[in-house]
Amino acid sequence: NGLQWDLSENWLSPSSGLASWTYYYTNLDDGLTYTVKSRATDIAGNVQTSLGSDSFIYDVTAPTAGSVADGLTNEDQEWSSNLTTMSAIWTGFSDALSGLASYEYSIGTQAGGTQAASWTNVAMDTSMIDSSLTLSSGLQYFVNIRAIDQAGNASSAASSNGVNTDNIPPEVTAAFDGSAITDQDFQQDSTSMIVGWAATDSRELSYYSASLGT
């Protein structure tokens, strides 16, 4: 079990002349270190006294999932007009036994989905940006992250809270100068001007901006 070597264990002999072989053993305990030892016997019957040895940790426990945020800053991204690019950062993934080996991401129209991008390995990076996407305006997309440990176990997928895509610009439906509700062609005040407008958007308006010129 890695802590001691029991000399009463039975030695297993492969077929004569094999340099490597496979033995399937199913009664292993998760988290324990196991040691495999080997010895050679020559044609004269002499047995190797200095044993070959190698150890491994039996690990079938998946890593612990963390959290994912859309965008590359500490402020989570909620909206995007870019239909080819998505990005995300993540923290909090861990593995107590063999340790983390890599991360993978996918992008979908639902948490855990792969509709926009299949699972892609990003080594040990804790951020991603994919500029090869074909997204649709008016949908919500989620970035999903899973961790892979040194033994090949995958964590459950952690998902962002989603980015809403919208590349349809708002429409100004009316604009008024000289009054907030009706358009005026002349005014006497030379120090200020009242401007009014109305606008619509297929999703949600964020803010207005106005300029004045000749």
Residue ranges and their predicted role:
Residues 1-29, 104-136, 207-214:
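Recognizes extended acidic, P/S/T-rich segments that occur
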Residues 42, 52-73, 82, 108, ...:
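Flexible, low-complexity linkers/stalks enriched in Thr/Pro that connect modular domains
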Residues 84-88, 191-195:
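Structural beta-strand segments of beta-rich domains
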Residues 31-33, 138-140:
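Extracellular Ig-like/FN3 beta-sandwich strand-entry sites
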Residues 41-47, 148-153:
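Short, solvent-exposed loop/turn segments at the edges of extracellular beta-sandwich modules
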Residues 89-97, 196-202:
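Acidic, Ser/Thr
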